[in-house]
């Protein structure tokens, strides 16, 4: 079985540890390792490497009328990898407390759906291509109540990942795991 040990950061080097705690750096490093392994394996088997696309972005729900909604999202372009372009999307749906279904393939970046009254619908989307399936978007939910006189909008303002707060003084260097940047 082929194996490797990847030494990427030193726990004795504070700048390295700042990177090691950064979720965005962790993702970039993991994706770079994945691409390297993929290219190596494809080269060994004389096949063309197709990199899995990045997760869609700007996922949103627009309420249209009488239980009709439109889900939409944008392709996330991987500027470093032209083969990571999605060829479609998988829309996963869960109703009330049930788990998500196996998904349905959607070729465009939007879809209109009808909601049954008094049920809570949960949606998430993944991008797909010949290389596989991306991570999913965050989960968005919708509820249709025919007697409603107003529409409620809930905005998810959480749009970033953060490392723990950095402590870097003359006396101390480290991280406050109870605070973030």
Language-model features: locations:
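Active-site-adjacent mobile loop/cap segments within catalytic or ligand-binding domains
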Residues: 1-45
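Short, solvent-exposed loop/turn elements at domain surfaces
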Residues: 14-16, 82, 160-166
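Pro/Thr/Ser/Gly-rich low-complexity, intrinsically disordered linker/stalk tracts
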Residues: 39-83, 117, 131-150
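Short beta-strand elements bearing conserved aromatic residues within extracellular beta-rich modules
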Residues: 87-91
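Short beta-strand segments within Ig-like beta-sandwich modules, predominantly Fibronectin type-III
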Residues: 101-108
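Exposed aromatic-hydrophobic patches
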Residues: 108-115, 140
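Beta-strand-rich modules
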Residues: 112-134
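Aromatic-Pro/Gly-enriched surface loop or interdomain linker
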Residues: 137-181
């Amino acid at each position: 079985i082929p194996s490797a040990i990847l030494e990427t950061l030193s726990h004795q080097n504070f700048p390295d540890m700042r990177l090691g705690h950064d979720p965005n750096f962790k993702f970039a490093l993991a994706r770079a390792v994945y691409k390297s392994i993929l290219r190596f394996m494809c080269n060994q088997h004389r096949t063309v490497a197709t990199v899995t696309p990045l997760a869609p972005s700007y996922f949103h729900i627009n309420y249209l009328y009488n239980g009709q909604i439109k889900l939409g999202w944008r392709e996330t372009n991987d500027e470093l990898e032209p083969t990571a372009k999605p060829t479609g999307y998988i829309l996963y749906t869960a109703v009330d407390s049930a788990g998500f279904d196996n998904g349905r393939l959607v070729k465009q970046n939007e879809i209109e759906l009808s909601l049954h009254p008094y049920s809570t619908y949960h949606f998430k989307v993944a991008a797909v291509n010949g290389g596989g399936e991306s991570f999913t978007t965050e989960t968005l939910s919708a509820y249709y109540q025919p007697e409603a006189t107003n529409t409620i909008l809930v905005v998810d303002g959480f749009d970033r990942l953060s490392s723990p707060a950095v402590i870097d003084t003359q006396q101390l260097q480290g991280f406050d795991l109870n605070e973030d940047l």
